[in-house]
């Protein structure tokens, strides 16, 4: 299954990279590599995850991030990659705008 990452989700990932870069040398690169491993795995596992706020939600394997996606005719569309420590109300509002 084809996996497409929307621009908004790419910006979310860039924010995560910037956060981890501030934590220590190489941490941002590690985050980037691991989050894309999780996203790439959706080509095989899309649809098995619970839905939250109208989207499927995959929990990232190595960081406290949540990958929100939907299944579309062309495959999988990742709409957001958000810090799982955020308030659920804030996540809901953000996802309604996407």
Model-derived regions, located:
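Solvent-exposed interaction patches of small proteins and small membrane subunits
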Residues: 18, 27-30, 50, 54, ...
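Basic/aromatic recognition patch in beta-strand/loop cores that engages polyanionic ligands
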Residues: 36-37, 41-76
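Enriched for short, Lys/Arg-rich terminal
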Residues: 66, 70-98
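Arg/Lys-rich, positively charged N-terminal/basic patches that mediate binding to nucleic acids
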Residues: 1-32
